[in-house]
């Protein structure tokens, strides 16, 4: 039991550390699988990068907690399940809090301004023509 628990926590820790470091460096691109994936964060690349930069430090900390608790579960055979559960809950709580912070940061970014002007063929009366203002 303690070997499986240690491996699961170790893999979770490495994954959280990798996502956190990529987020901190701004190298995590929008995707469907990892990172802060709220509607506000997925609006554009810059907002996604900001949200994951904010969530990066908590994700790295959560990864460290998972790795340390996995190591403790391996070393302390009699308390492996207790150390593993406490570490898992702690790591997921820290990662979740980081995701909330990243989501809130993304929500504070104003919507990008859309260019004004004609959006297609619906401009009647020469509205899109350079001579329309004459």
Show where each model-derived region lies:
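Hydrophobic alpha-helical transmembrane segments
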Residues: 1-9, 80-90
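Juxtamembrane cytosolic interface motif at the C-terminal end of transmembrane helices
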Residues: 22-23, 73, 100-101
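Alpha-helical transmembrane segments of multipass membrane proteins
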Residues: 67-72
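Cysteine-cluster motifs in flexible loop/terminal segments that predominantly coordinate metals
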Residues: 113-134
């Amino acid at each position: 039991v303690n070997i499986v628990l240690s491996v699961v926590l170790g893999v979770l820790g490495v994954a959280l550390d990798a996502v956190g470091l990529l987020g901190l460096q701004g190298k995590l691109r929008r995707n469907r699988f990892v990172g802060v994936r709220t509607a506000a964060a997925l609006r554009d690349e810059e907002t996604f990068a900001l949200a994951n930069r904010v969530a990066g430090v908590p994700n790295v900390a959560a990864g460290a907690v998972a790795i340390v608790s996995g190591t403790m579960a391996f070393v302390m055979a009699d308390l492996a399940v207790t150390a593993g559960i406490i570490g898992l809950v702690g790591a997921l709580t820290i990662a979740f809090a980081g995701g909330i912070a990243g989501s809130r940061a993304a929500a504070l970014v104003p919507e990008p301004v859309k260019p004004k002007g004609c959006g297609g063929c619906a401009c009647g009366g020469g509205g899109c023509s350079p001579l329309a203002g004459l």
